[in-house]
Amino acid sequence: MQNCLFIGVDVALKGNQFCVMNFDQHIYFNLKFPNNPEGNDMVINKIKDIENKFFFEKIIVVMESTGMYSFHPACYLSSNEYLNKFHTEVYQINACDFDKYKKSFHDLEKEDGIDAYILADYARVGRTKALYPFRGSQYIALQRLTRQRYHICKELIREKAYVLTNLYLSFSGLMSLDKNELPFSDLFG
């Protein structure tokens, strides 16, 4: 962990705040970049500048899981060829877990970049050991399967309701018959 670069990413619609620090909490930069491929390239160029001055073997990136805003930066950073030579691990953490961890920093002032700093510190103290690294293609496949299953279940419920409504409308007269006259009253008949 000593030769590791920790990156915290505070993801937003228009821009991502990146805080890059080492194990000794030396902050190399805490800057905002656009939330697009060009912005991610700018971050990678800044990391290249750091690599020219300092030695590190591994990169750990932590970002809050914010759905569609965090998915593309996570995919980009986890699949970048330059970053992969450092055995880069990208983690997306639950917003509730992050808020609980953030409450322990009660003495920090509210300013731009503080969330990115706390996310980088989350990785620095080893909180990512209980998490699984982000794998974009696996995530997309699982997401699509889950959504397809949900869609099929909803369609099945709708079709069952449709059939039951038609049965009731077609055979509503059977409801007024006595128990002895019901055509489907015998379980074994």
Where are the regions a protein language model picked out?
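Glycine-rich, often acidic, oxyanion-interacting loops/wings at catalytic, nucleic-acid
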Residues: Y150-G189
